[in-house]
Amino acid sequence: NVLENINDNLAIFTSRPDRNLKMLLGIWENLIIPKNKDLKLLVTNNSYDYNYKSIIKRKLSDQRNLIKDLQSSRMAIIPGHRAELYCLAAEEAKELCVPIVTLGIGSLAERVEHEKSGLIAKNDLQFSEYIFELFNNNDLWKSIRNNLVLQRGKNTWKKVAEELINQTDNY
């Protein structure tokens, strides 16, 4: 069930480490940890060197564990990357009804609707503020979560492929 067993202090990053994980770790270290050491960030296994109890490396395993990790997270934090054409991590989070906080880089501006499926920040400071907002504002979190529940299952591969083709036709 997508509505149970959520850790209210846990966020997750499931994209590839080269998709601005280093940027996210810097924001977490400088803007999140100093304000609340109880918050946890579950990240894709990577080679970056950091020593914070609040940043946890996910072991890459099977789909069931990824789904479990996503479902137990209050939000997905996905900055985005200029090379992304689609961002499967965002779609996975949305289908599992996990609100997203993003900088809207690359395709994330298209994958996330502000205050509908997540929050789109304009800069690093606003990004960190939106992370805190989703951790602390239950009404906003529930509103986005409920919208995601209503949208769940409405994206088919056919619809997504047609949208992608339409976007590429504009280039």
Where are these regions (language model features)?
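Conserved catalytic-core segment of nucleotide-activated headgroup transferases in glycan assembly
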Residues: 2-59
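Short alpha-helical donor nucleotide-sugar binding micro-motif in glycosyltransferases
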Residues: 62, 68-73
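Short alpha-helical segment that forms part of, or immediately flanks, the ligand-binding pocket
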Residues: 67, 90-95, 109-110
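Acidic donor-binding loop of glycosyltransferase active sites
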Residues: 71-85, 98
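Short glycine/acidic-rich beta->alpha loop that forms part of the nucleotide-sugar donor binding site
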Residues: 84-87, 94, 104-105
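Short glycine-rich donor-binding/catalytic loop of glycosyltransferases
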Residues: 98, 102-109, 123-124
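Conserved acidic donor-binding segment of nucleotide-sugar-dependent glycosyltransferases
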Residues: 114-125, 133-138
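A charged, aromatic-enriched C-terminal amphipathic alpha-helix characteristic of glycosyltransferases
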Residues: 122, 138-170
